[in-house]
Regions:
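Short, glycine-rich, amphipathic interfacial segments at transmembrane boundaries or analogous
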Residues: 11-15, 20-24, 82-121, 179-200
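A hydrophobic, helix-centered structural microdomain
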Residues: 40-106, 142, 208, 214-229
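Positions in alpha-helical segments
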Residues: 55, 70, 83, 123-127, ...
Length: 229
């Protein structure tokens, strides 16, 4: 795949049909098609336009809500309303991700992220922001700057990305996103290995139609609050 090559493997027809794997028939013999899968040539430039337009509209429509959130955060726990933390972007490039602060300013430590809703570092309003995913809204700035996309794999912390095996580093071949398959299919309810599987599936099958589907389904995921805390 890294060399851009495609090869085919003989397998059982019924095994691959249920897996949704692309196959070719050669003399009635099912061959699984493996290798490098590139999106449509216009996918990347159109996706960037969609990101810019979508993030701009989002900031205009959600601007009042973002200002309200910022005021509530500072009122409850004096300090900056937005925190910046290092994440790993496309091709391993480090960038500063923007989020609404959800922890008390004097105990802010995002090197170890909260793993449960009862974490004492989270403020009452911060818990509301996390459950409703409103804490993610400042990432629209990252999208406008070209560091993130509206849809993509979850942005990873550097100390976790440093432990990646070579095959896991393929997550870094595309821009991370505000939402993605991991976010709409369970978020923190999912084990880490399933998160990676969803990210790899997205990378191999990314398209504008797929991105649009994920954005629409994100609305339902946010309203259901599944896996959020």
């Amino acid at each position: 795949e890294d060399l851009g090559m495609t090869f085919r493997v003989v397998t059982n027809l019924f095994e691959v049909l249920t897996a949704g794997t692309p196959i070719d028939l050669v003399d009635d013999l099912p061959l699984v098609r493996l290798g490098h899968q590139r999106p449509h040539p216009f996918y990347e430039p159109i996706k960037r336009v969609v990101d810019i337009v979508g993030a701009s509209i989002g900031m205009i429509l959600l601007g009042p809500a973002m200002l309200w959130c910022a005021r509530r955060i500072v009122r409850e726990s004096p300090g900056p309303a937005i925190f910046r933390h290092e994440r790993v972007g496309r091709d391993g490039k480090i960038f500063q991700i923007h989020k609404f602060r959800t922890m008390y300013a004097d105990v802010e430590d995002y090197a170890v992220a909260p793993t449960e809703a009862s974490d004492s570092r989270i403020t009452p309003f911060g818990r509301f922001l996390r459950v409703t995913s409103l804490d993610e809204l400042p990432q629209l700035f990252n999208v406008l700057k070209g560091e993130m996309s509206l849809v993509g794999p979850r942005p990873e912390m550097p100390f976790i990305a440093d432990t990646y095996d070579e095959w896991q580093r393929r997550r870094l071949s595309v821009k991370p996103g505000i939402t993605g398959l991991w976010q709409i299919l369970g978020r923190k309810d999912l084990p880490m290995h399933e998160n990676l599987q969803y990210d790899f599936y997205y990378i191999r099958n990314r398209s504008l139609a797929h991105d649009l589907s994920i954005m629409v389904r994100t609305i339902g995921a946010v309203l259901s609050r599944r896996g959020a805390f």
